[in-house]
Regions:
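Hydrophobic h-region of N-terminal signal peptides that target proteins for export
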Residues: 13-23
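Bacterial N-terminal signal peptides that target proteins for export
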Residues: 1-11
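N-terminal mature ectodomain segment of secretory-pathway/periplasmic proteins
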Residues: 28-110, 144-146
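Flexible, processing/modification-adjacent segments and terminal tails
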Residues: 24-33, 43, 100-170, 190-196, ...
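Gly/Pro-enriched, hydrophobic low-complexity segments
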Residues: 52, 87, 150, 154-250
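Residue-level detection of beta-strand scaffold positions
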Residues: 12, 81-85, 171
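Short, surface-exposed linear segments at secondary-structure transitions and domain or protein termini
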Residues: 74-79, 102-105, 121-126, 184, ...
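A short, sequence-level motif marking secondary-structure junctions
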Residues: 69-73, 98-100, 116-120, 178-179, ...
């Protein structure tokens, strides 16, 4: 659950993987409210899984790694995501919220940054918190919430937040499956001048009373940047608070070390 760079793939629209049909527009806020209401009081508050991460260098050669990811909704309403980069006992990883991140090396804090994880409001927060909070957290994506189109994604009805024309394949945008009320695609930019990253969330499985995308693929300028394949997922179990502290990185009680 990380965002590496960013891109759009115009070929996707050309070959019909993504098609958009004009329909009566609604606001992005209304779409987020629909997502929230569909699972209010039902969505899981904890999640953990093993992630096979494949990254592609400038020459296209892949490198492989195993990450261990733990997510929880805190009592005060925050979504936290801990990513252990390799063996949790090595102490290397990142702790994310929607607006901040803390990088650890050898179990010591190496950096604290005012940039968060843009996935979190869309895969967890939207179902657990007031929509106004989700709107604030998504402001940094620069998705235009006043623009909405309806269409299809991989043969399923979808709503696209952030565009007003079927020809727009470059503006920041969020695609939401109409039946499941989950995000299936995002186009996001790190800076206004950089190409967007095209992020696909797929292979959804029903977990608890919600859903989990078990494969994420990211491309920039049509070239793969990172793919994520999830395994051994579980929801609804207790996660030790020690896994989510920002002043220390501890593997004590980590589910992957038991």
């Amino acid at each position: 659950m990380s965002i590496a760079s960013r891109l759009t793939s115009p070929l996707l629209l050309a070959v019909g993987s993504a098609t958009i049909a004009a329909a009566q527009p609604a606001s992005g806020r209304d779409v987020l409210q629909r997502m929230h209401d569909a699972y209010a009081g039902k969505w899981y508050s904890t999640l953990r899984f093993v992630q096979k991460t494949t990254r592609y260098g400038s020459g296209g050669a892949p490198t492989f790694a195993t990450w261990y990811e733990s997510l929880r909704q805190t009592p005060d309403g925050q979504t936290q995501l801990r990513i252990d980069l390799g063996d949790p006992t090595a102490g290397n990883g990142v702790l994310y919220t929607a607006d901040s991140s803390w990088v650890f090396r050898g179990a010591k804090l190496a950096a604290a940054r005012p940039e968060g994880n843009e996935f979190l409001p869309l895969i967890e927060g939207v179902y657990m918190q007031p929509v106004d909070a989700t709107m604030r957290q998504l402001a940094t994506t620069n998705v235009d919430m006043s623009r909405v189109m309806h269409g299809t994604w991989e043969g399923r009805p979808a709503t696209v937040i952030g565009i007003a024309s079927p020809a727009d394949s470059v503006s920041p945008q969020i695609w939401v499956d109409d039946e499941r009320n989950v995000v299936v695609r995002m186009l996001l930019r790190p800076t206004p001048s950089s190409p967007p990253m095209d992020i696909h969330l797929g292979d959804y499985v029903h977990v608890g009373d919600g859903w989990l995308a078990t494969k994420v693929a990211m491309t920039v300028d049509g070239k793969p940047v990172q793919t994520e394949d999830y395994a051994d997922w579980k929801v609804g179990m207790p996660l030790p608070a020690d896994l989510f502290t920002t002043n220390a990185w501890s593997a004590r009680g980590h589910w992957a070390t038991r």
